[in-house]
Swiss-Prot record:
Record-given protein name: Protein EI24 homolog
Species for this entry: Dictyostelium discoideum
Gene Ontology terms describing biological process: DNA damage response; macroautophagy; negative regulation of gene expression; positive regulation of gene expression
Record keywords, A-Z: Glycoprotein, Membrane, Transmembrane, Transmembrane helix
Protein topology in the membrane: Multi-pass membrane protein
Compartments where found: Membrane
Length: 307
């Protein structure tokens, strides 16, 4: 029977080939995400893909990003020069410009992009020779619940990322989190269209393929992460359709060597899941308390009309 020391030594020795396999899987993910030529060719050949991708470029690249860059590098410096002695007026113009143009366009782009991304994913799925799963009534209800939980989960992750960004020397941690999140967003369309897995199953699959998934999202995140928020989001919105298209034909690989100290599965979404579950429990408790309070409130007695 091996001692604890022998067990630890064996695990450490087996970690070296495991690390090599990890970097190999990361590179496979990077390589699959760099096949942009194939995604562009598919986009050009398909009318649906081409139309929706042009919409994404026009809205995000020209209307939103273009006008924002014009303001940032032309209008704003000119205003600062002209209103050098009236900084209050310059600040007022900035507030008005962002309130009436930048943020409304940004919100509209989020809504429009969601529709276009879905169309792009569906068409890519069909082009790849796959067929979508026909949902039953129970399946539709389950998908609706999944979608609510999914949006809450992503919202919590983004809030956590924003909080981490304010902590010194955590930029790398934030980059890793966003890389995994972007990668999940790319593949989630494919998994939803298959219709075979619920959200928790999709998360489990993602977490057991953590090395490949990190590699797949690495280039995508690098292209937008280091820019200011609005510019980075615009770049993300332009590139995202291409990475969705590539994810449809990608074949993620998980780590085979389990004898080292590297984990088989990294619980990437563990903390956000706990927070979402707490939020949902508090909401249900609040609704139940409110419903009980309403049921115990006496109804007003009817008044009698006197002649």
């Amino acid at each position: 029977m091996e001692t604890f020391k022998e067990y630890v030594t064996k695990r450490i020795d087996n970690t070296i080939p495991q690390v090599k396999e990890m970097f190999k899987l990361i590179w496979l993910g990077v390589a699959d995400s760099m096949k942009l030529k194939g995604a562009i060719i598919r986009t050009i050949k398909s009318e649906v893909l081409r139309k929706n991708f042009i919409h994404c470029i026009f809205l995000n690249g020209i209307i939103f990003l273009g006008t924002y860059l014009i303001y940032l590098y032309w209008v704003s410096p000119m205003l600062n020069y002209l209103l050098n002695h009236f900084p209050t007026l310059s600040n007022m113009f900035t507030i008005i410009y962002f309130s009436l143009w930048v943020y409304p366009v940004y919100i509209f782009s989020i809504i429009a992009n969601s529709k276009w991304y879905t169309e792009i994913a569906k068409e890519s799925f069909v082009i790849s020779g796959r067929t979508t799963f026909a949902n039953s009534t129970n399946g539709i209800l389950s998908s609706f619940v999944d979608e609510i939980y999914r949006n809450l989960l992503f919202g919590v992750i983004l809030v956590m990322s924003a909080i981490i960004a304010f902590i010194p020397y955590t930029n790398f941690i934030n980059f890793v989190i966003i890389t995994w999140l972007y990668s999940f967003w790319c593949f989630d369309y494919k998994w939803i269209l298959r219709g075979k897995w619920n959200l928790l199953q999709r998360i489990q699959y993602f977490e057991t393929h953590w090395a490949y998934m990190f590699g797949y999202g690495l280039i995508f995140t690098t292209c937008s992460f280091f820019f200011p928020m609005l510019i980075g989001n615009a770049i993300f919105s332009i590139l995202y359709p291409l990475f969705i298209i590539l994810s449809i034909s990608a074949k993620p690989t998980k780590m085979v060597n389990q004898d080292g100290i590297l984990p088989k599965q990294i619980p990437i979404f563990y903390v956000p899941e706990i927070i979402v579950n707490v939020i949902l429990k508090l909401y249900v408790k609040y609704k139940n308390t409110r419903g009980a309070a309403k049921s115990t409130t006496p109804s007003p007695s009817p008044t009698t009309k006197q002649n």
